[in-house]
């Protein structure tokens, strides 16, 4: 399926040049930018061949330093070196300060209670800090790709709320780039592995980064990623593994008190040991202490595994809770995706494999997998992948509607409507006392349901039992930027409602869309005739239904010859309604209307008499 180049059948959409777009993983610890080049998605390196950019910003009186330059001063100038700003996004200062963690920054609350950092550069908020991280990534991309970006896809945690997502968009706006889409990080990882095309089922995304652990349980159904549950620990990550090794070194070397410089050296060596034990069973730690003594220690993978075992088991417990929250079992999980550098640790991979009962996906660099998925999405959104199996629409390719009586289609959202979009229409009941209404959502340009594509069916229960036509049901079609359709039906007086979600683009190729459009044009005249016939048949059924109810209630008001005339006209209408002569049905409806005019007048007189019965002139 292709990103739609909308054109009428028989015409060709204008070709376009390759458009520049990238995916950005705006991470808590590190950030990356990726792009699709020559059909392959990969992260982009800076001038020093470094792919990751530490998410660290240092503010001095004269300059703003980002990445490794800023990180180098994190111990010397912690007050003005902001790390993990992602944790501050969309949160109030009260919320931040009420937590157990203390921060070296000088804070001030904004007018709406959000945190502001006081720096030598003045006051900056988390959005501005995030923008300062985004800026070098955008510059790197434009320099590497050789042009101006048309847009970016930025990844965010699945649990980010609207305020946090909006803050991320505003950070991009400060840099001057267009956000094509905010993409959930676990969804990006799944896209990188191609899990969005073809497969259906439950996917677990295990994300163990430097400072945080996240587990996301996704359900993939007909092209739609639904987040079933999320969990994790915002204070557990690979950094904790490093600190455990650091403590082990200090204990083995009897270092009771260490300087800030030695402490940092121990931590750096701990990270090297952790990385070495990923591929080796043993390695040696070497550190020079404050007195110039060279300290050495052999560390085995078994020793390291024993140290971190409790922490790894803690992540598995989070996985168990997330599955329970999602209401699924490990047997239902078809794939487990590993994200984050700390998932390289063999014990982590082993425990995850044991828990889910299958080998996790690790072929893509876990540090880069989210950015790569975002790049694939960005490339599609700007129209660079005409053969993509992902159909991500910026317009509605075929009209969306609902079935009405007689098998007719009431179009709610017309084709070529730009998305996101919301449209609503009101419907009513057909019969007296009707307490439920079945809805059939369809797609296509034809006038009858039988000629359109069925998308979904659902039922609204709890409608008040009123006379036919008295209940008002508002049906809202909402299509988001990802082409996901939500249809909500709500009875207005009670507020009772039901909702269903569907992806209209799933399983639909450009060729099929073109064929459906051509069919609608070729059959337009016949379809209109069939629709007019169906409408008259529905009108006839409605007239006969309401008249039968009226005769059952007030038939005694008629003389025998009057009743016979009406029944004869009703029988004729019922007979013609089964045939295919629209004009004859319309004539029969008019004839029945003429035959019942005296009956309608008698019913009105009788109703007035009953209403006035027992009333005096003075009370009227």
UniProtKB/Swiss-Prot annotation:
InterPro entries named in the record: ATPase_NBD, Heat_shock_70_CS, HSP70_C_sf, HSP70_peptide-bd_sf, Hsp_70_fam, ISC_FeS_clus_asmbl_HscA
Q: Which BP terms in the Gene Ontology apply to this protein? A: iron-sulfur cluster assembly
> Would the keyword ATP-binding be found if you checked this record's keyword annotation?
yes
**PROSITE patterns under this entry?**
HSP70_1, HSP70_2
Q: List the disulfide bonds.
A: none
Keyword tags: ATP-binding, Chaperone, Nucleotide-binding
The answer on whether this UniProt entry bears the keyword Chaperone reads yes
Q: Which domain of life is it from?
A: Bacteria
The entry lists its GO molecular-function terms as: ATP binding; ATP hydrolysis activity; ATP-dependent protein folding chaperone; unfolded protein binding
- Similarity section: Belongs to the heat shock protein 70 family.
Its function, per the record, reads: Chaperone involved in the maturation of iron-sulfur cluster-containing proteins. Has a low intrinsic ATPase activity which is markedly stimulated by HscB.
Name assigned to this protein: Chaperone protein HscA homolog
Q: Which organism is it from?
A: Shewanella piezotolerans (strain WP3 / JCM 13877)
Task: Report the gene name.
Answer: hscA
């Amino acid at each position: 399926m292709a990103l739609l180049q909308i054109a009428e059948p028989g015409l060709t959409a204008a070709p376009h040049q390759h458009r520049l777009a990238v995916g950005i993983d705006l991470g808590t610890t590190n950030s990356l930018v990726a792009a699709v080049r020559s059909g392959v998605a990969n992260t982009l390196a800076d001038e020093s061949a470094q792919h990751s950019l530490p998410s660290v910003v240092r503010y001095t009186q004269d300059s703003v330093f980002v990445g490794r330059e800023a990180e180098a001063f994190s111990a010397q100038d912690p007050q003005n070196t902001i790390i993990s700003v992602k944790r501050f996004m969309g949160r109030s200062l009260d919320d931040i300060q009420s937590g157990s963690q203390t921060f070296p920054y000088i804070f001030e609350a904004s007018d709406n209670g959000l945190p502001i950092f006081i720096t030598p550069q003045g006051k900056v908020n988390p959005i501005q800090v995030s923008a300062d991280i985004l800026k070098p990534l955008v510059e790197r991309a434009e320099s590497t790709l050789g042009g101006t970006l048309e847009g970016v896809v930025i990844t965010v945690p699945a649990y980010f709320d609207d305020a946090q997502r909006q803050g991320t968009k505003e950070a991009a706006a400060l840099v001057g780039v267009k956000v094509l889409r905010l993409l959930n990080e676990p969804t990006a990882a799944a896209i990188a592995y191609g899990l969005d095309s073809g497969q259906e089922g439950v996917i677990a995304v295990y994300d163990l980064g430097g400072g945080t652990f996240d587990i996301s349980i996704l359900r993939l159904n007909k092209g739609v990623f639904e987040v079933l549950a999320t969990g994790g620990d915002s204070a557990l990550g690979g950094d904790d593994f490093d600190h455990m090794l650091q403590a082990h070194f200090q204990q083995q070397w009897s270092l009771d008190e260490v300087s800030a410089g030695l402490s940092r050296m121990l931590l750096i060596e701990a990270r090297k040991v952790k990385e070495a034990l990923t591929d080796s069973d043993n390695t040696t730690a070497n550190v020079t202490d404050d007195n110039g003594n060279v300290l050495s220690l052999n560390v085995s993978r078994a020793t390291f595994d024993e140290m971190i075992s409790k922490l790894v088991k803690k992540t598995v417990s989070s996985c168990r809770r997330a599955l329970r929250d999602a209401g699924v079992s490990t047997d239902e999980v078809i794939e487990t995706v590993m994200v984050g550098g700390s998932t390289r640790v063999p014990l982590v991979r082993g425990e995850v494999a044991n828990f889910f009962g299958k080998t996790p996906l690790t072929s893509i660099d876990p540090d880069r997998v989210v950015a790569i998925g975002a790049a694939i999405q960005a490339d599609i959104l700007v129209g660079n992948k005409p053969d993509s199996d992902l159909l991500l629409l910026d317009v509605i390719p075929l009209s969306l509607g609902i079935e009405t009586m007689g098998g007719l289609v009431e179009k709610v959202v017309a084709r070529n409507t730009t998305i996101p979009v919301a449209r609503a229409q009101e419907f009513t009941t057909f019969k007296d006392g009707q307490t439920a209404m079945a809805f059939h959502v369809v797609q296509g340009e034809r006038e009858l349901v039988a000629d359109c594509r069925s998308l979904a069916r659902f039922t609204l229960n709890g409608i008040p039992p009123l006379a036919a036509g008295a209940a008002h049901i508002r049906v809202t079609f909402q299509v988001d930027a990802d082409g996901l359709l939500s249809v909500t039906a709500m009875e207005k007086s009670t507020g009772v409602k039901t909702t269903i979600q569907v992806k209209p683009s799933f399983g639909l190729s450009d060729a099929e869309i073109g064929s459906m459009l051509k069919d609608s044009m070729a059959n337009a005249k016949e379809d209109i005739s069939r629709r007019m016939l169906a409408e008259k048949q529905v009108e006839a059924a409605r007239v006969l239904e309401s008249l039968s109810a009226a005769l059952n209630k007030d038939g005694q008001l008629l003389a025998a010859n009057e009743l016979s005339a009406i029944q004869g006209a009703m029988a004729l209408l019922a007979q013609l309604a089964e045939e295919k002569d629209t004009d004859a049905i319309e004539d029969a409806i008019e004839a029945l209307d003429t035959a019942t005019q005296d009956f309608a007048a008698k019913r009105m007189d009788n109703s007035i008499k009953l209403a006035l019965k027992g009333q005096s002139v003075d009370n009227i």
